[in-house]
Amino acid sequence: CIIGAGPSGITAAKNCQQNGIAYDIFEKNNKVGGNWVFNSATGHSSVYENTHIISSRTMSEYEDYPMPTTYPDYPRHDHLQAYFENYSKHFGVYENIKFHHTVDHVSKDSNGKWQVEYTDNQGNKHTKIYDYLMVSNGHHWMPKYPNYDGEFTGKWMHSHDFKGVTDEWRDKKILVIGAGNSGCDVAVESARVSKHIYISMRSPQWFVPKFMLGYPADILVKALEKLSPKTRQKL
């Protein structure tokens, strides 16, 4: 049993298929891609409207299924969603995905088998027993809310619910807590319309441009790793 038809789930299914292992793959959304399926409704963990991947195309593709060369160096979310869907179709996984199927509960029975309870696309409840379980739904699906002393009277939201800026953000002062991928994305996006944007971070971070010397930064860093430490220091 594979839970989730995102980037990890579909490659897990592909490897099962190539080794003659029967599997079911459950996906509660209507498309392949996991977080890369844009959905403007909050509640679904997804990218926001203008998301581009933070790693370059050649550093993000599957080794056995390259991304199209027509894609930009840093593809948009719709490029990624199409890429994952085409990957699943190319390797014969797509037709085995059970869309709009939600896994409700998983437990081990007395024989050490996995008992999976799920709801199908018609709203019917089922229970099925599996020898192995692969959880591939990612770790971004459940937002975590910190507790802070004091009182805040302005509007606040979790990045999980951020789908893009609206005119409501215009000329506002915005504080982003956290300098991870989501925090930096929200800061950059909101900077287009806000009056001031601040980032609060617990630990110091290096902010590196996406391009260096005309190349995607991660490709350049990978090339520099081949040089001796002494040569890298000189550079």
What is the predicted function of each stretch?
Residues 1-32, 37, 127-128, 133-235:
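Rossmann-like dinucleotide-binding core of oxidoreductases
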Residues 66, 120, 161:
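Residues that form ligand- and interface-recognition hot spots within folded domains
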